From Swiss-Prot:
Substrate binds at residues 102-103, 262, 267-268. GO terms for molecular function: 4-hydroxyproline epimerase activity; trans-L-3-hydroxyproline dehydratase activity. PANTHER family: TRANS-3-HYDROXY-L-PROLINE DEHYDRATASE. This is Protein Spea_1705. It catalyses: trans-3-hydroxy-L-proline = 1-pyrroline-2-carboxylate + H2O. The lineage of its organism: Bacteria, Pseudomonadati, Pseudomonadota, Gammaproteobacteria, Alteromonadales. In vitro, catalyzes the dehydration of trans-3-hydroxy-L-proline (t3LHyp) to Delta(1)-pyrroline-2-carboxylate (Pyr2C), albeit with very low efficiency. The physiological substrate may be different. Displays neither trans-4-hydroxy-L-proline (t4LHyp) epimerase nor proline racemase activity.
């Protein structure tokens, strides 16, 4: 039988994008390493604004089907914009751009070290990253088996509002707290409201999570103390004491952006959660807790120090989790492709 040879290089005919894909505790991250033009702007927020206004077609191309999916997440590496940083990053998802992403930081550090983009010897290395939420200090190190692990100290995180309630259309009265951990989240006790945080209840979690987000957005004004661009509610996080790992403190299910479900416990989400717990006197400084996810992934988070940020009293969270590279991809834009902007199905 005659064999067929497929020419692998199409880049001379089509515009291409190269990515390295990874996941942290089950949540995907698509690291874009080539294909974008120069990202203009002197600050990371200016760069995000430039991408939003001029290059959003590329986000849709790489996040949406048929190249991505409704729950895809991306990281676009930029040059550093502060003297301390090694590089900058913009985070992408199905709806737009986030201010910070904990699982993304952990996966990005793993990718940068495992591909030797950052040299990691035998000693732990500090890596500083410009994000829209602020400067992130990550640490890469080798464990006792020589495997690369990562953790990061997040931006100032705080309890923004406690013991609030809102009437949610089609569901009823919901009690919630609001915390900031690089993004704002509404936290809802799923057990109190009779909502299962299991994988078999994803449809209800998405539906109610979106309803809660919209209800809170309509009734509660968020004002970030420094950056207006960060003054928005990113998602709803359901918390539950019903865990599968006996060492876990609780379970998180985060519904964010346009109904995305985080497979991980959510790095910024566990950061804001530990700030809420500290504000309520339910956790002490430097006391790590494990939070598990809807797919039984887990992150370890602690309040490493108290902090004060422009009048907001909070903590500096430290977060760790496991990340793994899953593939390297070269995506093309056929100029005749009728779905260059992609699409989303649920």
């Amino acid at each position: 039988m005659q064999s067929i040879t497929i020419t692998p290089d199409l880049s001379s005919n089509f515009k291409d994008f190269v990515t390295i894909d990874a996941h942290t505790e089950g949540e995907p991250l698509r690291v874009i390493i080539s294909g974008y033009p120069e990202i203009k702007g002197s600050t990371i927020l200016e760069k995000r604004q430039y991408v939003q206004q001029n290059l959003d077609t590329y986000r849709k191309l790489l996040m949406h089907e048929p190249r991505g999916h409704a729950d895809m997440y991306g990281a676009l590496i930029t040059e550093a914009v502060t003297e301390e940083a090694d590089f900058g990053v913009l985070f992408l998802h199905n709806e737009g751009y986030s201010s910070m992403c904990g699982h993304g930081i952990l996966a990005l550090v793993k990718v940068m070290c495992q591909t030797d983009s950052i040299d990691l010897g035998l000693e732990p290395r500090t890596i500083k990253i410009d994000s829209p939420a602020g400067l992130i200090t990550a640490k890469a190190y080798r464990d006792s088996q020589g495997k690369i692990q990562a953790s990061f100290k997040n931006v100032d995180s705080w309890a923004d509002a406690l013991n609030c309630s809102v009437n949610v259309e089609g569901f009823g009265e919901v009690n919630y707290d609001i915390g900031f951990g690089g993004a704002y989240y509404a936290y809802v006790d799923a057990d109190e409201h009779g909502i299962s945080c299991g994988q078999d209840n994803v449809a209800q979690l998405i539906d109610v999570g979106r309803r809660i987000k919209h209800a809170v957005m309509a009734s509660h004004t968020l004002v970030h103390p420094l950056e207006e661009d960060l003054s928005f509610l990113y998602g709803t996080i359901f918390t539950s004491k019903k865990v599968t790992n006996p060492e876990a403190h609780s379970r998180h299910v985060c519904i964010f952006a346009d109904g995305e479900v985080d497979r991980s416990p959510t790095g910024t989400g566990v950061s804001a959660r530990v700030a809420l717990l500290y504000a309520k006197g339910e956790v002490a400084l430097n006391t790590p807790i494990m939070i598990e996810s809807i797919v039984d992934g887990r992150m370890i988070v602690s309040a490493s120090a108290e902090s004060e940020f422009h009048g907001k009293q909070g903590v500096i969270p430290e977060v760790s989790g496991r990340s793994f590279i899953t593939g390297k991809h070269q995506f093309f834009i056929d100029p005749d492709d009728v779905f260059q902007n992609g699409f989303m199905l649920r």
